Amino acid sequence: MPAPAVDSSRFRHRKISVKQRLRIYKSHEIKDLEQEDVSAISSQHQQRELMEIETGVEKNEEKEEHLYKILQSNQLRENKKDLFIPTPDASKTWDEFDRFYQGEFKCPTSYIQFSAQLEDCCGTLYNMDEEDEIFLADLNKSLADSVEPLTEDEFELIMANFESSIKDRQPFLSMDPESILSFADLKPTMLKNDVGDSGVKKELAKEIGMPEDEPFLTMFDNKRPLGKREKNMETLIELFGEKIHDHWKQRKISRHGCDIFPQLKSERNNDKDDNDPYVCFRRRELRQPRKTRRIDVQNSQKLRLLCQQLEYTKDLALTVAKRERAVLEVLENEKFVFQARAQLKTMKRKLGIDADNEDLYSAKKQKLVSSVRTIKQQQQLLLQKQLQIQQQQQQQLQQQQAAITSDSSVKRAKSSKSSKLHKEDSGLYADEKGSEPKKKGPKTGSNKNKEQSLSSAQEIGAQSPVANVSNVQQQQKQASSQVYVKLPNSKIPDIVLEDVGKLLHSKEKSTRKFVEDRMRKRKQEDGDIFFNLTDDPYNPVFNLSIPDNVSPQDAPFSSVAGSKFEVKTSYYSPNLQNYITGTANDIKVFNKEGEAVENNEYKKLEFFNPFDNEIHTHSREFPIAFRRRRGRFNMEYIDQRKTDHNINDMLLQFIDLDGIQKQELDNDVINVYDSKLDDLSRSYYHWKYDSNYNIYGSKFSDEPAKLNQISNDTQVVRFGTMLGSKAYEQLRDATIKYRQEQINKRKKLNSLQQQQMLQKGQQPINNAPHSQSSSPPSHQDTRKNPGSTPNQSSPPKKHVTPNAAA
């Protein structure tokens, strides 16, 4: 008998599949089924179906008693007034709140920076409490006057070293806290550990190349007076190790061998304890599979790029530190040389040595020329080299021409000149000129070229020397570019090649002309009656200003929104070009004396682009207020309003221009977050990009948390862990894939080697019968092949196993 369904809209009966397990009841197991209460069967059926419906809550949380009852009441539509989840009462106030929390938060001018990773790297993991403060005060009082007192940072460093060394030596100290090691046993381990800034500074000193004994400061070190050196771990342990060990031992025993400051508990791979309420981070076993991994790939690529950029910045900082270290060494060497020269000079005067003082004076330093050259400088150098080569070639040609003219007579020169002029006028080609060497006698091709260049130079003798140089260069280019065959002018097509810039310029020009023609036609149709605002593109809501008398609820979505908003239109104006060039007649300019100025430069419109990065100037000027009034003959005047207050004092309330100027003139290396000039430049863009609210009033960053119905902090933690887990999974899959490929390659190589060994082992076995039939085996053959016997009747060993062959 099927159980009746509670509600067809709430439950969906699924089809019975082959993979689903069904329970089979026998006849003797079900007795008096018709007499049983139908309501009991229906309630059991309802409870069974309720457990199978997804509630949107994790499976572990569904078993909670109060939540389970509420979910059942929601599905069964029962009365829910008496059901609730008990929560602690948070309505009570704390009377001593003002005693412990004092002061008011002041919003800083720059962004608030915080980095937990940086704090962990630069500071110790041990924090002092009241007991440590009392012990440190007593310890400093008991010290001698010659010994410097122990600071809080040094005390925390020693305590953290004790904690880390005891974890390495006695990891199971909580089983027997009284068996804690003595100071003599822990001392070697403490000297090896690098706790806090000391280990980081040692590695940094090795990379820069500085000696370990030489002190140096970083940006993260605390400010201390000059001459006071930082104590290393060895000196701290020698001075205060035993005294602090007794105090640390007492605190460790009181904590039963555990950490003095308890750490956050997290769930490991194998250790799973759902009953421990102090576990703050648990592993999620079930994870919804995602359909695409494109976002994961993009995030991993961004992380790789960020890692590369950080490595580049680290290398750059190290190279700068090495350079400054080299400069410091140079200065120290110069100082040492100067002091040695001063001592040498005094010694010479005492001993009365009269010698040259060349050693006392250093030679003048040569000016350092940077080897870095820009593209323009390289191009200029190439041009200079080419000009020098051309000048050398011209000088060689002139020398050759002078030698030829001295050898030849004046008559032959005149006859050759007249003959060449006659041939050029008659239009003879190169084949007719080629017959000249036969008439004049045996001459080489070089002499022929020399005579031709000489004749051409004599013909252009009346021209300027610059023209002669250009002609010689053209002849050299023609002589060097004789590789390809020249086509006659009749066969060369007259094609003018157009580049992309010209095409885009013409296209933009045609589109502008088309739009301007359409706007001019629309202007003529409308006339001077009204401006047509329907030609403008639709402006978004956040770029428009709403008047006070219009309700903002229905205005952005109404049909008459264009008439309610104050929109900056872009309608057509026929006199706009005159306003831009300053040739408009309806604009007049007057100077301070009231005289009209006819210069068109003062009539031009000034264009301002608020999104241009280069137009912002940081100055002490204050915005000036103007007013418009009409005078006689309906003339329109613009006056400047007078301000009673000092505009510079009012501006300095918001911007510290003196501090910015002082910081820039100091010319020190400034962190980008501490730069006041950068803070001022960011303030210009605060109104554009730093809006935390949308048109509905809620923060943009809270929208994903609202969609998931969780808090914003939980959403941030979930998103960060998701990125980390996805990147780790991708890296793990890549390593597994790479290892599988290497294993497959290794298997293929092994199989190929085994096949080659099998083939080598089968070759002597196949050749054995032929050698036996041709000639009996000798004594030497038996020595070489001990496996073969002289008995021919014995069958050869054809079956060779791979192991034997190997």
Curated annotation (Swiss-Prot):
Keywords: Cell cycle, DNA damage, DNA repair, Nucleus, Transcription, Transcription regulation
Complex formation: Component of the NuA4 histone acetyltransferase complex.
Top-level taxonomy: Eukaryota, Fungi, Dikarya, Ascomycota, Saccharomycotina
Biased composition, class Basic and acidic residues, residue ranges: 421-439
GO terms under cellular component: NuA4 histone acetyltransferase complex; nucleus
Feature: compositional bias, Low complexity: 751-779
Comp. bias (Basic residues): 411-420
Transmembrane spans: none
InterPro entries the UniProt entry points to: Enhancer_polycomb, Enhancer_polycomb-like_N
Record field: compositional bias (Polar residues): 785-795
Alphabetized Pfam families for the sequence: EPL1
Protein name: Enhancer of polycomb-like protein 1
Name of the gene encoding the protein in the UniProt record: EPL1
